[in-house]
Each structure stands twice: as C-alpha cells, then as structure tokens.
Regions:
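A glycine- and small-residue-enriched flexible loop/hinge signal that marks low-structured segments
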Residues: 21-240
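Surface-exposed interaction regions enriched in Ser/Thr/Asp/Glu
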Residues: 1-25
Length: 241
C-alpha cells in the first residue's frame, strides 16, 4: 500500500573512470607470479568456471588496431582448445584526431587498418537512444547474439542482423554534420564487411550478417562470409573437445 512506499532511500556505489583505462590494460598479460589481466584473463574462464568463451568484445577500445589484433589473437585456441568470435567497432575519430564520420571514411579506415579478420565482425558508426545515451554497436550486437543463442539452447545458429535495438538514430560524434543513412545506402558498408544499424520496419535494427573478412565481389572463403557460419564452426569444434 501507499504507506509502504513512504520514506526515503539512499544508495551508494562506485563508478569506474574508464578514461584511465589504456589499450595496454585491455590487452593485459600474465606475470611470472601468475597474475592475469586484460584479455589474457580469458584463459581463467574454463579452469575456474568450466565455461567456454565464445564471444569477445571490448566496446570503447576495440577500435584500436592494437586491441583488435590482440582480440584476434586471444580468440584462438583458448587453453589450447577453444575458439571464440570477436565483435568490434570502427572508430568515429582516428589516431590523428581526424573524424571518421562518413561511409567513405569508414570503409577506407577499415581497409587501411586491416580490420578484416574472418573470426570477427566490425560495426560502425554508433547509436543513441531517446535519453541521449550513446552506444557502441558492438555492445548491442553482443546482447542480441547472446539473446539469440539462449533461444536456441546456446547454439549460435542465428545472426544478430535485423534484430531490433533500443535506439533512435545513428551517432557519428558530437560535432559531426552527418544526419545518417538508410538501409539502401547502408549496403555500401555491408558490402565491405562492416555491419551497422538502420531504421527498418518501423524500428531500428542491427544491419549486416557478414564477417569483417567479407568484401562484395572479392574472392572470400565461403565459410568466412557470414558471421553465423564462423560461429557455428567454432561451436562444433569446441563441442568435440
């Protein structure tokens, strides 16, 4: 009743200052005394929890070539056995402080920085919700991949492409002039192995089901064209071990 709702409530919490986190912290390593940090700590998942890592993401840092390459290394033969799939982002600003705020620039940046791993999927740009919260698309993609996996008894048989996400527009940076693009224009990204978000069917959805290795018209290993194909291959080989 109303009486139970009367009064005040206080709460305390700690918040991480992620501005102090460097690429080297995400990459991490293992010390001679057996301390694990960053991506290297993935090796602790199986011996401590008997769980197999199948997705690796680092939103906010995966746009760094050093971190992306470390993720690609970390996803292979974890504990000498398991393989995982990387979900990463392209930057909105490059290492020289130049904006990556158009489709043409995003495609050029991806190629120049070799964000083309077949064990990965990359996203651009970002997205914002009705409260002004900005999301890396890799964050939203991992949520939808996990949701789809759960609906299929943890079998990664469904892509996150065309899944609804809680945003209202694309985001290219606080000072960007870009007003966004539609599904048809977004195909320029997906044809170059870049997944994105578009307005479709009366809602905003993730768009693109290719791996980062895909380029339309290029000679691409058929198994590495679609994200779901690579994830299913990993699931099968992981299950056999």
């Amino acid at each position: 009743d109303d009486a139970q709702l009367a009064g005040s409530l206080t709460a305390s919490f700690s918040e991480v200052d992620d501005s102090e986190i460097a690429d080297s912290d995400i990459i991490g390593g293992v010390t001679s005394s057996g301390e694990y940090s960053g991506l290297s700590a993935i090796a602790l998942l199986y011996p401590e929890q008997f769980a197999v890592c199948n997705l690796i993401a680092a939103p906010g840092w995966s746009h760094s070539p050093a971190v992306y390459n470390a993720m690609l290394t970390a996803c292979k033969k974890i504990n000498g056995h398991w393989d995982a799939f990387v979900v990463a982002d392209l930057p909105l600003v490059d290492s020289t402080a130049q904006a990556v705020d158009t489709i043409t620039k995003a495609i050029a940046w991806k190629k120049a920085n070799a964000f083309t791993g077949e064990r990965s999927k990359v996203y651009w740009p970002q997205a914002v919700d009705n409260l002004g919260n900005v999301f890396h698309l890799s964050t939203l993609a991992v949520v939808e991949l996990m949701r789809a996996d759960f609906s299929h008894n943890s079998v990664p048989m469904e892509t996150c492409g065309n899944k609804a996400i809680p945003v209202i527009k694309q985001y290219f940076g606080a000072n960007a002039n870009n007003r966004g693009f539609d599904q048809q224009t977004g195909k320029e990204l997906t044809q170059n192995g870049i997944s994105t978000a578009v307005a479709w069917g009366g809602e905003w959805v993730l768009w693109g089901d290719h791996t980062a290795a895909y380029t339309y018209g290029a000679d691409v290993d058929p198994r590495a064209i679609f994200d779901v194909s690579m994830r299913m291959l990993m699931h099968i080989t992981n299950d056999f071990q």
